[in-house]
């Protein structure tokens, strides 16, 4: 079975994760895909495939004869999708021989356009896969799962000798909880790759340092007709807080290694308001400065409006895995050579986000990230090509070959 055929099947399984439930997995939907994957792994000869109580799928492929004592290499992808644009099941749409121009996404009224996504012109002649425009596609990260499965199927012909291989599919990556119950010992790999990137040929081992900030504002609500020097409008103090952050340090205005503050939720009235941010920066020192700047603004506003008016809670999420991967750069070298031998230019880029691999690297499992061929994740314009997925499979297989050469 081709990788894209698997993808078309997987995306129809509804698997959004949720930050609201506080459970692991965060949604029971994810077990639907997990059980399907366990069955497929067993059909592919992965006899010990199973899913645990937290919805982690594990499986192991024995080494080729003579390679039993070699280091263990793993491949990981995640089963959940974002919850945005995911209030009903996905309907994938295939467009053969895409012309590189505007493409109407079903009857949604949305148009996938090179004006918004300039790389689309480079996909001319390929077979494009999208949703119908009413949901995400779910290639993030079901494309990674499909590609790993296809790699396993290809290995069954025994043309690529290899040591012990370890496979895992995780829940809740999109809410930053993918590694929360990941059993590194059970997985068993010495090194691994996540397949959770974008363009085929992408190789990533630098990611954001990340934190979440919740800012609570407590006001004093007095009748507006008699509130002179008394009222403290929590909503206005919240606006003041946000105005004191650097106006250009937003996702829209930054790229590459530039960090940002992202205000993703705002709620409030006179009595109470809440701002929720994510804080991101590749550089650890700059990351600390960002957190301290929010603490300083909190201090200033409490001095102005009264103690307890502003309350800041910052929660660390993950760190830049570069400091771990720097000790095993052969993983990046293998991936780079693999891309070149598959006639795809290696694209080494910083991750403007995080992957399970970032946290797993700090749990003792060095784990850079590889591109799957997908684009425009987390929204209705998400897309991928059949050809890009095929290349990602070839690169993965070549990495295995080089790792055990």
Give the ranges of each region predicted by the language model:
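N-terminal capping segment at the start of a domain
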Residues: 2-28, 129-130, 318, 378-379
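A non-catalytic alpha/beta surface segment that caps or lines the substrate-entry region
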Residues: 22-70, 74-76, 80
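Midchain, well-structured core segments that form catalytic/ion-binding scaffolds
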Residues: 112, 126-139, 171-295, 299, ...
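Metal-dependent amide/peptide-bond hydrolase catalytic core
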Residues: 235-405
């Amino acid at each position: 079975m081709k990788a894209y055929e698997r993808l078309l099947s997987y995306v129809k399984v509804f698997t959004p994760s949720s930050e609201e439930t506080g459970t692991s997995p965060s949604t029971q939907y994810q077990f639907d895909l997990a059980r399907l994957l366990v069955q497929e792994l067993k059909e592919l000869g992965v006899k010990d495939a199973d899913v645990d109580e937290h919805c982690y799928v594990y499986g192991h492929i024995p080494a080729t004869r003579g390679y039993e004592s070699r280091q263990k290499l793993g491949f990981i992808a995640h089963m959940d999708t974002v919850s945005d644009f995911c209030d009903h099941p996905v309907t994938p749409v295939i467009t053969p021989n895409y012309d590189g121009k505007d493409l109407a996404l079903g009857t949604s009224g949305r148009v996938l356009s090179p004006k918004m996504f300039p790389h689309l012109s480079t996909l001319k002649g390929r077979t494009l896969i999208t949703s119908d425009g009413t949901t995400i596609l779910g290639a993030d990260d079901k494309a990674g799962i499909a590609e790993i499965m296809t790699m396993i199927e290809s290995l069954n012909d025994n043309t690529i000798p290899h040591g012990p291989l370890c496979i895992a599919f995780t829940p809740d990556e999109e809410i930053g909880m993918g590694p929360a119950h990941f059993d590194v010992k059970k997985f068993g790999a010495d090194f691994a790759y996540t397949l959770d990137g974008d363009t085929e040929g992408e190789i990533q081992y630098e990611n954001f340092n990340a934190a979440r900030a919740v800012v609570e504002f407590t006001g004093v609500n007095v009748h507006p007709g008699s509130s002179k020097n008394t009222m403290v409008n929590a909503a206005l103090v919240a606006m003041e807080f946000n105005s004191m952050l650097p106006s250009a340090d937003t996702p829209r205005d930054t790229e590459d290694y530039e960090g940002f503050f992202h205000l993703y939720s705002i709620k409030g009235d006179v009595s109470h308001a809440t701002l929720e941010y994510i804080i991101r920066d590749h550089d650890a020192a700059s990351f600390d400065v960002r957190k301290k700047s929010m603490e300083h603004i909190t201090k200033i506003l409490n001095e102005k409006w009264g103690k307890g008016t502003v309350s800041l809670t910052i929660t660390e999420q993950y760190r830049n895995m570069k400091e771990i991967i720097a000790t095993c750069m052969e993983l990046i070298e293998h991936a780079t050579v693999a891309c070149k031998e598959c006639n795809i230019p290696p694209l080494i880029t910083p991750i403007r986000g995080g992957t399970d691999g970032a946290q797993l690297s700090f749990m003792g499992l060095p784990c850079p990230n590889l591109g799957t061929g997908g684009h425009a994740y987390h929204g209705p314009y998400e897309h991928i090509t059949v050809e890009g997925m095929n290349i990602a499979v070839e690169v993965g297989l070549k990495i295995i070959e080089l790792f055990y050469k």
